[in-house]
Regions:
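Serine-dependent amide/ester hydrolase catalytic core
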Residues: 1-78, 128-133
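Structural helix-boundary/capping segments
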Residues: 15-19, 27-30, 35, 77-134
Length: 134
């Protein structure tokens, strides 16, 4: 709710400037797909925090989990790209994940790579009681 209120308070000129930046950023990111089929990026900078802990460490300092957990996912959502996030296997911690990013219309490439990563044992995490069933 607080983010919606903050957005509603933006002046029109700021909104127009943000849309210009979004178009420019979209062009830059789409150009990357002339060289590669899929981009791979971390989903978050650290393991997931416990529900009762509202902070994470950012640059060695405690910071708001809510304000900082989306730092790696939000920029890739801005240009409207298809993104698939998947958990890494056997990290020994709370979930860590990867983002697989493709050009619009190339969602099949994301699913194909995710399946290969899972088959190689690099991705895919199951609750303890489901591990034998998988």
């Amino acid at each position: 709710r607080d983010r919606l209120l903050a957005g509603a308070m933006l002046p029109a000129s700021t909104y127009v400037q943000a849309q210009r930046f979004r178009r420019w950023f979209r062009e830059q990111v789409h150009a990357a797909f002339e060289q590669v089929d899929v981009l791979i990026a971390p989903s978050v900078m650290c393991e997931a925090p416990l529900l009762d802990n509202p902070t994470i460490m950012v640059g060695g300092k405690p910071a708001s989990a809510r304000a900082n957990l989306g730092l790696y996912t939000q920029p890739l959502s801005l240009p409207g790209l298809p993104v698939l996030c998947l958990p890494l296997s056997n990290t020994g911690t709370l979930p860590l994940g990867l983002q697989l990013v493709a050009a619009p219309g190339r969602e099949a490439a994301l699913f194909s790579l995710a399946r290969k990563l899972e088959q190689a044992g690099l991705a895919g995490r199951y609750p303890h009681n489901m591990q034998q069933a998988a």
